[in-house]
UniProtKB/Swiss-Prot annotation:
Protein name: Uncharacterized membrane protein YNL033W
Segments passing through the bilayer: 85-104
Location(s) in or outside the cell: Cell membrane
Signal peptide: 1-24
Keyword Endoplasmic reticulum: no
Keywords: Cell membrane, Glycoprotein, Membrane, Signal, Transmembrane, Transmembrane helix
CC terms in the record's Gene Ontology section: plasma membrane
Positions in the Cytoplasmic compartment: 25-84
Chief location category: membrane
Extracellular side: 105-284
Membrane topology listed for this record: Single-pass membrane protein
S-S bridge residues: none
Glycosylation sites: N270
Length: 284
């Protein structure tokens, strides 16, 4: 069975092996201290350190493995209390945004710049898409999430906005069935978001972990570090939005509302770099 100890060990081992081939992520050092809320984070940035490819690959493998562990821990019969539920919802949203970010990064690195290229990747399905980016062993595990995807174009134009719609199916191990996630962006989004101020988020203190709602995650927070790889100096805004959405999904009436957040450009206040919304099919 999927949730047996042997199955989990096998999947995590496959994730480690396949993820060790990923050598493209930067490893810098920044320490982040927080007080009680996410908006009060102060970043102390260290000078850039020489990239160590072996360390980079190991860090990436660790982050992927931890995300996979959350999938197992969030199975409905393992939920224990509202904090646990909030943590599962939060990690689910982190997973979707991380997968989306790595999709754009994969397309850029392989010079697949057309809408058709993106549609082809999205058409593979969530698990197969993840497998194409990180390796088949990882993708097979993520297939159990039973997520379907499609691209839509709400506005016409040469640089038109795109929205990735991700739908959780009835057979998903994530208990948010009939949930639609809408991630809207344009072709410049990743470049705009991923600006780095010479470092990466690597450490959060225990108090900040509780403030973010990560009730059962190590204070080192590799998932947050992975988000910083994609969202750079906008990570704080993204985390704030993720926390808001996680709290919404923790309410029994979440199906009756359309909730989300937008990340605005700091250079062009009227420009939306990224928007994320979650809602039930009943609101379509």
């Amino acid at each position: 069975m999927l949730y047996s100890r042997e199955s989990r060990t096998t999947v995590l081992f496959l994730a480690l092996v396949t993820s060790l081939t990923v050598l493209c992520h930067s490893v810098d050092v920044t320490t982040v201290f927080t007080t009680s809320t996410i908006t009060e984070i102060t970043t102390v940035t260290a000078a850039p350190q020489p990239q160590n490819k072996a360390e980079t690959a190991l860090n990436t493998a660790t982050n992927i493995i931890q995300t996979m562990q959350f999938l197992f821990n969030c199975a409905p019969f393992k939920w224990k209390g509202p904090l646990k539920i909030t943590s599962c919802a939060l990690n689910f949203i982190v997973l979707l945004l991380t997968a989306w970010g790595y999709l754009l990064k994969y397309l850029q690195e392989n010079k697949l710049n057309s809408d058709a290229d993106m549609e082809k990747m999205v058409g593979l399905g969530f698990g197969e898409m993840v497998g194409r980016i990180f390796g088949k062993g990882v993708g097979k595990a993520f297939t159990k999430m039973d997520i379907t995807q499609k691209l839509v174009y709400p506005f016409e134009g040469s640089n038109r906005q795109k929205c990735l719609l991700m739908t959780v199916g009835e057979n998903s191990i994530v208990p948010f069935h009939d949930l639609f996630t809408e991630i809207c962006f344009d072709q410049y989004t990743l470049d705009s978001l991923s600006h780095h101020n010479h470092g990466s988020i690597s450490i959060l203190d225990a108090g900040s972990v509780s403030a973010l709602g990560f009730a059962d995650i190590s204070s080192k927070m590799p998932s947050v570090s992975e988000l910083y790889t994609l969202f750079g100096d906008y990570t704080i805004e993204v985390l704030g939005g993720i926390t808001k959405l996680a709290s919404t999904l923790n309410r029994e009436d979440w199906q009756g509302e359309r909730n989300g957040f937008a990340v605005l450009s700091r250079d062009r206040p009227n420009q939306t770099l990224l928007s994320v919304h979650m809602y039930s099919s009943s609101l379509l």
